């Protein structure tokens, strides 16, 4: 999602609050909870899940392994839910022609670098760069080459842009910033 006028362009970045992350976190939570319940029911000898009797799974070694997988899955699921709630990777890109400034903001993990805020002048932007890697998993990433700071990614590596979409986005941004486009 973006908002643009003659002088200002604001591009909102989604971050980790994507539908696929919600689905994976939910599926992983339910699966690991099921593994933990099966392992626990084999330990106490009572049916906590009525799908099959607990006598079919003995605690040593199957119950221990299922409990371990359940606990490990709950840890991974809680990590996913934390990244979703913190919106890691979310933020915005703000290009202001009137003031001649570019501001890039992203949310990070809690701690010292929770708020990642980059600010620089538009005249320091050397080019907009498109990096294309073809193959089994094609990757197209848009970078902004800044003097003294190197290449700053503007799109995520997991966004699946078609060649036409990434070229269109790069052309619009390069036109707005009045800088050349490089393709690698």
UniProtKB/Swiss-Prot annotation:
Disulfide bonds: none
Function of the molecule: Seems to be required for the assembly of the photosystem I complex.
Signal peptide range: none
Entry protein name: Photosystem I assembly protein Ycf4
Superkingdom assignment: Eukaryota
Pfam families, sorted: Ycf4
Location(s) in or outside the cell: Plastid, Chloroplast thylakoid membrane
CC annotations in GO: chloroplast thylakoid membrane; photosystem I
Organism: Buxus microphylla
Transmembrane segments: 24-44, 57-77
Keywords: Chloroplast, Membrane, Photosynthesis, Plastid, Thylakoid, Transmembrane, Transmembrane helix
GO biological process, alphabetically ordered: photosynthesis
Topological relation to the membrane, as annotated: Multi-pass membrane protein
Recorded family membership: Belongs to the Ycf4 family.
